[in-house]
Amino acid sequence: MDKNTLQLSIGFYENELCRNILPFWLDRCEDKVNGGYFNCFTNDGSRLVSTDKYTWSEGRFLWLFSKMAQMPKPFTDAERKEFLRLAKSGRDFLVKNCFIRDDRPLRCVFLMDETGAPKTVEGFENEGYDMSIYADGFVHDGLSQYSIAADNKESYEIAKELYLSIMHRFETYNYRTLPYPISPEYVMHGFYMMRINYSYNIYLASQKFDPQFAEYAFTKLRESVDNLLNLFTDEGGVLREVIYRGGGRVPGIFGNHSNPGHVCEEMWFVLHAADLLGDPSYTEKCIKCLKKALELGWDPVYGGLYHFVDSDKGGEPLPGDNDPVDEPIYKQLMSGWSDKLWWVHSEALYATLLFGERANDKELLDWYDKIFDYTFKVHPNPDREIREWVQILQRDNTPVTKVTALPVKDPFHITRNLMYILRFLYTLEK
């Protein structure tokens, strides 16, 4: 990237983060009465439709504000101080309200009302409050990052306890995965992916507070990367979403579909981990998987990346004779495969830029330009009073009101990727 393009890119992304995305959330998300954050907005951001609080999103907010509080650029000292205050609001709300402490390992409530009182999920009223190990993981990540930002060892100790609980439950298959429930004979790529993130975050925090535990987290980080790449990818670079619990490919489209956004996200997870591990050997396989996901996932008619695709030929996943049609993931796959989602394109932007520049890979840099043009044509909200992205589009890029995971408008992927894009671009200035 030449100097002029670099400076233009930095200016563009600073504007997108600081003048378009963050103002929406800074004006709307804080619950000044109870603590924590609101984010149950409509897809276009025009209305707050519920004051419920999903622990999944509360933990993500905590991570974002904690991370931004540590960024020297593009924020001022006053802004970083405000981010840390907002992070503390979420941290205190979660620590006060979200944990389930009994004779089992530490777990988190999945859903709370605005005061922090636990709520059951519609359709799962008799199944308790701890409905998703993913939600536990986002709380863990938020507390890990907050412990670093605020130099708060108590938050680290809670994050460590939660990390050990998550890993134990994963290894004993004792967990649930709302909003992506799946039968016990299957395992989803998503949790193996998130294990990398959990191990990465607790490693960073333990380096500050607990060097002995950092050695354990370092080992788990490498193990998580190897398991993910060995179990879910093939020699052609295809990364499938679902396998059998004991390993092995699931027949039919249920085992033969991919999520291009997950692959983009996963590959930069692995690269970040590889940097920390000091092991560049993962890069070649990551690039192969990334290129394959982009090839399979791109819509040649309307542009953009599909939500789900056939892992062999790309495009529409076609049903087979023996597909598990009652699996919720299968239903989501078949009904929403062609959706164009905000988070998919933000992940693709960062992944293609990062790998393209670091590997000097023209094909990936061309993909970055293509994804950039598409993303900033269709996702930014044309209503300048809102500006935050329209998050869910139909195949033809028209907005649609629907729920893809939780009934929330989530700032996490856009904000995190804009932060990471800027952080990377700043390194190119040096």
Regions found by a protein language model. Give the residues of each.
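Glycan-recognition and catalytic cores of secretory/periplasmic carbohydrate-active enzymes
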Residues: 1-430
